[in-house]
Amino acid sequence: MPKAKVTKNSIAPVSSNPSANRTPVKINSTGTPMWYKVIMFAFMLVGLLWLVANYLVGPQIPFMNELDAWNYGIGFGLLIIGLLMTMGWR
């Protein structure tokens, strides 16, 4: 009668409780400081408010009227800075 092939899985001892072999690891994570979160959300909020103000009252505000299409760059730039900061948020 032919014999079955021996595989690595059949040789290795199988533990009934796989977590018994593991040692607990402490995660030393303090999280993101409060000032980082405040600045991140402030960038996003100011960018959004800049775009809304440009849309609603842009022609009536002299310096926003002079910036013309740069208002979109400023507004979206502030939003993008806030969104890029979310990658550092833990």
From Swiss-Prot:
Q: Name one GO biological process term.
A: cell division
**UniProt-listed InterPro entries:** CrgA (IPR009619)
- One Pfam family, short name: CrgA
Q: Out of the domains of life, which is the source? A: Bacteria
Biased region (Polar residues) positions are 7-26
- Say if the entry is tagged with keyword Cell membrane: yes
The UniProt annotation puts the region (Disordered) at 1-26
Membrane-crossing residue ranges in chain numbering: 38-58, 69-89
Where in or outside the cell is it found?
Answer: Cell membrane
Give the GO cellular component terms, alphabetically. plasma membrane
Q: Does the keyword ATP-binding apply?
A: no
Cysteine pairs bridged by disulfides in the record: none
> Its topology with respect to the membrane?
Multi-pass membrane protein
Q: For this UniProt record, give its keywords in alphabetical order, as a comma-separated list.
A: Cell cycle, Cell division, Cell membrane, Membrane, Transmembrane, Transmembrane helix
**What HAMAP family does the entry give?**
CrgA
Entry's family note: Belongs to the CrgA family.
What role is this protein assigned? Answer: Involved in cell division.
What is the protein named?
Cell division protein CrgA
Which source organism does the UniProt entry give? Corynebacterium efficiens (strain DSM 44549 / YS-314 / AJ 12310 / JCM 11189 / NBRC 100395)
